[in-house]
């Protein structure tokens, strides 16, 4: 069950931005940046764990560390989730794809289980 809090938009510092962007048909964003992942790759190799899972875990931890990325509009209210999960496509043996839901976890071993 998702836990969240409702943000009081009357006193919210981001209210003006929210008012402007909520008028858009699809108020979302995408982010593409180069990431130096060699150390993470070496860490995964040393630990004999999946680089993909370790990178996904690191990205989810980073996203959860930014309150604004945990915020959503729901029933005309702004809410902030305590924690985010992630859904990602994973290739199957037959080269098809399956969507996999991954809950946030405090430790990588629990995340990758």
Language model segments and positions:
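Short polybasic amphipathic segments
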Residues: 87-90
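Basic, often amphipathic N-terminal segments
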Residues: 12-17
């Amino acid at each position: 069950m998702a836990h969240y809090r409702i943000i009081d938009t009357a006193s919210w510092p981001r209210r003006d931005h929210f008012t402007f962007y909520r008028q858009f048909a699809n108020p979302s964003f995408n982010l593409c940046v180069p990431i130096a992942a060699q150390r993470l790759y070496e860490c995964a190799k040393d630990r004999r764990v999946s680089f993909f899972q370790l990178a996904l875990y690191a990205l989810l931890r980073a996203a959860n560390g930014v309150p604004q990325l945990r915020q959503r509009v729901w029933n005309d209210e702004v809410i902030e989730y305590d924690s985010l999960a992630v859904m990602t496509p994973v290739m199957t043996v037959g080269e098809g794809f399956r969507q996999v839901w991954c809950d946030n976890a405090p430790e990588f071993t629990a995340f990758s289980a």
